[in-house]
């Protein structure tokens, strides 16, 4: 079957100087139901490429600095001399790696981070967006309308490499997807870009999480697919998205509705909303007159719940008023 045309923004964007000073991230989110217990969980799969040209053959993490002094240098530190005051035991290492991040969101959160040398990443074939071959596990692939792969992180891995962070576990997936609602305009800036490739994405297939099978049905997958790339991540980071709405007026499920909020972009957020076929877009980098406020605060829940997060976003202009309030 002929490969489907891949949107330009979906492709790997790390070209030119971004090869040594840039990142590219694809994120997919879907609900799935356990075939054993019937429990529903929200799963995520992310593909990361960071500074791939800096160290193609070796995975280098920037989370852990490296010792850059000799034994002779170190002896001056022991007596607490003046030299010790200017002694720097570690030096910053620019990261260079490809990573698969996968797991579960919400109360039963689990995040597995699996790192690889950048050279395993392939992005030059027309039939897929990116592919990463592994020695012992199936290749992790992201194409225009499907994704498949597997990752495994052991307790031994985390003890040997605490800089990996995250949790131990296994996850494999084989998913097809179609995007029913997208937003054509993206947030574009010098250091970071954001594209909502599938604000409402319908997934189908299976996920095996820690040896338990979960089924993904397109009718209730409530999927999401977006992408970030550039020179630096947003900090602080703010993100909300959903395609699971019920009308308070009619009580019916709004199948053709979605919202996505992301920032901070110079103390602003982009708010993208589609209500039953009508797109309403407020972009942080556009000069359109609008007022936007957003916040995320910790709140005390019940004894069983513990601390809760209260998210709020409010945006309005001359035509629209949109309030998002999530507990």
Name these PLM-found stretches.
Residues 1-327:
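Structured soluble/peripheral alpha/beta segments that form catalytic or ligand/cofactor-binding pockets
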């Amino acid at each position: 079957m002929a490969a489907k045309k891949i949107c330009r923004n979906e492709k790997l964007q790390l070209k030119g100087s971004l090869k040594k000073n840039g990142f590219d991230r694809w994120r997919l989110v879907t609900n799935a139901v356990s075939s054993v217990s019937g429990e529903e969980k929200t799963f995520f799969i992310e593909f990361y490429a960071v500074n791939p040209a800096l160290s193609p053959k070796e995975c280098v993490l920037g989370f852990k600095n490296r010792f850059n002094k000799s034994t002779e240098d170190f002896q001056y530190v022991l007596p607490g001399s003046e030299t010790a005051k200017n002694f720097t035991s570690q030096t910053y290492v620019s990261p260079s790696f490809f990573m698969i991040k996968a797991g579960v969101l919400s109360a039963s959160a689990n995040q597995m981070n699996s790192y690889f040398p950048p050279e395993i990443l392939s992005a030059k074939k027309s039939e897929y967006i990116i592919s990463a071959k592994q020695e012992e596990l199936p290749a992790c692939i992201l194409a225009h309308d499907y994704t498949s792969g597997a990752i495994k992180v052991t307790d031994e891995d985390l003890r040997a490499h605490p800089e990996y962070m995250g949790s131990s576990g296994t996850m494999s997936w084989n998913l097809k997807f179609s995007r029913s609602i997208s937003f054509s305009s993206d947030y574009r800036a010098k250091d970071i870009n954001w594209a909502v490739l599938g604000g409402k994405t319908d997934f189908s297939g299976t996920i095996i999480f820690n040896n338990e099978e979960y089924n993904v049905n397109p009718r209730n997958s409530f999927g999401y697919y977006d992408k970030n790339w550039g020179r630096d991540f947003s900090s602080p980071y703010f993100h909300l998205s959903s395609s699971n709405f019920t009308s308070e007026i009619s009580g019916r499920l709004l199948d053709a509705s979605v919202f996505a909020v992301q920032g901070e972009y110079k103390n602003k957020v982009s708010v993208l909303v589609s209500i039953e076929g009508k797109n309403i877009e407020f972009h942080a980098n556009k000069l359109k007159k609008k007022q936007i406020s957003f916040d995320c605060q910790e709140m005390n829940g019940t004894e069983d719940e513990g601390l809760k997060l209260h998210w709020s976003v409010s945006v309005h202009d001359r035509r629209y008023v949109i309030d998002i309030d999530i507990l």
